[in-house]
């Protein structure tokens, strides 16, 4: 509780740079390689995706592995990005009657399950979220054993496995928190 929207905040922060790749450069590197990238957060997962020529697969995997473990957290950048997300919330939800209705419906329909909270987060949680919260979330959940790598296109499976091992293989697994089942009470 109190951290609704944290996954979405991390999605934004994942483009702010590592020791190896300065802030804002991730997308530029992909673009210079002839590709495009983006990300989105849903209720169950966050997706980071690149679309580029198969000859650039190693580049994409190297960049993803780097930001999985080497993300740089700047307090200034975090505050700036939180303001962007709060404005995004105002524009997409607070100023949109249909979005407000949908948000209220989910909060009513789900009494116990996390689906009751908006992906973007409640404004009060965003206003009170700190850099340490984001760092803890990143250090807890961003790990190869909590990641699904999907590669599709004209590629050889052996090449994908080899490159995935090369870039992600040295990243240690993390002990993930035990997830507790969220059982909804009967509704009448």
What are these regions, as identified by a protein language model?
Residues 1, 20-56, 92-146, 170-188:
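Non-catalytic beta-strand/loop surface segments
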Residues 5-18:
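Active-site SXXK
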Residues 8, 48, 64, 85, ...:
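Divalent metal-coordination and catalytic microenvironments
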Residues 15-18, 69, 74, 155-158, ...:
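Bacterial peptidoglycan biogenesis and beta-lactam-recognition machinery
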Residues 16-20, 51-82:
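M16/insulysin-pitrilysin zinc metalloprotease superfamily fold
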Residues 76-80, 96-103, 155, 162:
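Non-catalytic accessory/assembly modules
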Residues 82, 132-167:
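Non-catalytic, conformational "gating/processing" segments within enzyme and secreted inhibitor domains
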């Amino acid at each position: 509780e109190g951290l609704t929207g944290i996954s979405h905040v991390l999605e934004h922060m994942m483009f702010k740079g590592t020791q190896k790749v300065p802030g804002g450069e991730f997308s530029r590197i992909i673009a210079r390689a002839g590709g495009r990238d983006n990300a989105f957060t849903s209720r169950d997962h966050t997706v980071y995706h690149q679309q580029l020529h198969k000859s650039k697969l190693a580049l994409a995997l190297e960049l993803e592995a780097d930001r999985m473990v080497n993300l740089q957290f700047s307090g200034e950048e975090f505050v700036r990005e939180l303001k962007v997300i709060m404005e995004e919330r105002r524009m997409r939800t607070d100023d949109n009657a249909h979005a407000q209705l949908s948000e209220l419906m989910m909060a009513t329909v789900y009494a116990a399950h996390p689906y009751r909270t908006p992906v973007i987060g409640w404004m009060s949680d965003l206003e009170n979220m700190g850099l340490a919260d984001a760092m803890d979330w990143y250090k807890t959940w961003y790990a190869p054993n909590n990641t699904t790598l999907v590669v599709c296109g004209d590629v050889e499976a052996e090449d994908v496995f080899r490159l995935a091992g090369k870039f992600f293989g040295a990243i240690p697994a993390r002990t993930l928190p035990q997830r507790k089942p969220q059982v909804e009470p009967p509704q009448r």
